């Protein structure tokens, strides 16, 4: 008579322990991902808003078309200026390599894309969604050598990289345009495909398994725009004019332990986190 209730109690305790462990792991992973994105985004010189990512009547070259991968939606896209230490041989040294104490430092631009992804090759990931990251960086060159010198390029650009079109006119009337118009002109190197993005975090909410809702991006800034689906596993409020973004992540610990993994409103098993970051880098000379 005592065995059945006791067994039920033990199963209940074990189930609760499993849920709590899954929740704790998910909370930690969400915070770790936010910390990583915060450090990454702090180096930004330009952040794309929804108009830049998804297009508009005024922008017929959305950057999503340039950074497209199957089963992935770009949610956070920005340019940053990377510091490269001990890369450039001193003036008068024609080689590609030099000792660390003699090398000069330099900066190079790179494009960073964070995706909300349901891509799952060979079912190696969870049934939930993921956040994936792509970075493509410009070449590192020896600024002391002519461009036709064999040693001019120290490290080649990543596949698919094209320079930022800052000096390009935005229309056929030779109008220079503003910064947003210039950045919206960027196109990838069509002769070279990107390497695939890498997973930053698994077990985030998908669009179909989250509670519906709205997000007021004006709380971030008056001109911030929503990118992605509100209250999904990954979305942002981005303001290109201020190089500013608020990043939201909703984890899904239920996907670790059960098939029915829909996140209800305020579910403790679908922990959320956010971070607001303003890029601190500036455009400048590089290479």
Please give the residue ranges for each predicted region.
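Short helix/strand-bridging catalytic loops that position acidic/His residues to coordinate divalent metals
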Residues: 18-25, 55-64, 93-101
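A sequence-level detector of short, solvent-exposed, charge-rich linear segments
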Residues: 21, 25, 29, 52, ...
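Short, glycine/small-hydrophobic-rich surface segments
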Residues: 43-78
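Intrinsically disordered, low-complexity regions enriched in Pro/Ser/Thr/Gly and acidic residues
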Residues: 80-287
